[in-house]
């Protein structure tokens, strides 16, 4: 069998048990505890969003206000930690190559309308962003922008490309797979940079958007890949994909969380 066909078959098999979502966040290297349904607007499953017109493109399925908010300051480091089934397993299948992005929006919007501002993305350098995320135990960091104090949604996005050679509209069993989690974050104190106009999700990603269709298996040069969405906001403060701390919470598949402690 041709290598490309084998690779596609392998990705199909792996995708059945390779999904992911965010467990919680770290602030300046301090674990804020299990955030699922506590300060993370956790979806009921770790399945991806594949329909670009689905309202779940904003904050995944079951977007709603959850009980708590994590307190940060402008210029703090905010780290997302992804997981598969438990906190100590591989966070996603190694076949799920692709980029990572982080957006921010005022919480009052509930993620609706042209409110999402991209503050970080990472595609391919010497390896795909997701490959490096696996090595980093699912942890990637953004620096909290110098935006005014208030409540915000920080939206982490993985775009897995292992089935992105075909549009979802052409084959509902395929298409780019978006793993999305939104964290409720309170910035206090804040800064004086005004967020620019954002994009709407759903809406901004369409079948013709660069980065939605990509064939991992036909020899395409990954350094030419362009991530979906706008460029990173020019006043964003950057981020990285790297391990910031070793999880210490008990290994559990329950959705119960503990109160976040905020920045230390």
From Swiss-Prot:
Disulfide-linked positions: 59-182
Subcellular location: Secreted
GO molecular function terms noted in the UniProt entry: metal ion binding; monooxygenase activity
Signal peptide: 1-18
Keywords attached to this entry: Carbohydrate metabolism, Cellulose degradation, Copper, Disulfide bond, Glycoprotein, Metal-binding, Monooxygenase, Oxidoreductase, Polysaccharide degradation, Secreted, Signal
Enzyme class: oxidoreductase
EC number annotated for this UniProt entry: 1.14.99.56
Residues binding Cu(2+), per UniProt: 19, 96, 179
Applied uses, from the record: Lignocellulose is the most abundant polymeric composite on Earth and is a recalcitrant but promising renewable substrate for industrial biotechnology applications. Together with cellobiose dehydrogenases (CDHs) an enzymatic system capable of oxidative cellulose cleavage is formed, which increases the efficiency of cellulases and put LPMOs at focus of biofuel research.
Main location: secreted
Binding residue positions for O2: 162
Cofactor binding mode and count: Binds 1 copper ion per subunit.
Family under the similarity heading: Belongs to the polysaccharide monooxygenase AA9 family.
Record's protein name: AA9 family lytic polysaccharide monooxygenase A
Organism (species): Phanerochaete carnosa (strain HHB-10118-sp) (White-rot fungus)
Top-level taxonomy: Eukaryota, Fungi, Dikarya, Basidiomycota, Agaricomycotina
